[in-house]
Amino acid sequence: VTGRVAHGPNSEQSGFESLLEKDYLLCLQFDASVEHFEVQSVQVPVPGHRKPYTPDVLVRYWPGPRGGLIEPDLVEVKPKDILKRKAEEFAPKFKAAAAFARTQGWNFRILTEESIRTQRLENIKFLREFRRRPQDSAREQAVVNMLSSLGTGATSASLVQSLEPSGGVDSFAIWYPVIWRLVYLRKIEIDLDVPMAEIVPLWLPNRRAS
């Protein structure tokens, strides 16, 4: 399976060679600690092999909260069953990649579906459904302004109730798609590691919920 996945507000394109790799790229796109990533940009010489080994992704991170540098990750994405079945074939490649990464000040990591296909991925896939929703500038600005006035402790439900004090059966149907689109665009933030429900804590960037 190969293809390209669009991400971000400008629909940037990244290539993938498996569905698991596609899922990992989606997770990277919503990871605030990631500065940028490069797909198959590194070739690692493997002793005894004519062809170099090309790991899937090189991930670079923003400095930590105290300004400390975070070492980049050179990442291979593989399902557990393939890793087990082809362990002998992969061993020299992974050994070479780990050694090469150390010379660059990187970490070499092997990720499987256990660490990729999580609640975070489920939430990201839900939010992606709103990426092509037509922009509604007036409502989007109203959401941002109201969330700013509510401050920390706001939830999706309290935000809608503040936008539509009179309530009504259609208020959530009207406002939730606007809110989720803004979350997808990262103009509003939520905790992606917890299940999304009708009441979801949310906040503006750099104004983390308490």
Which residues are covered by each model-predicted region?
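Electrostatic, structured charged patches in enzyme active sites and in nucleic-acid/phosphate-binding
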Residues: 1-210
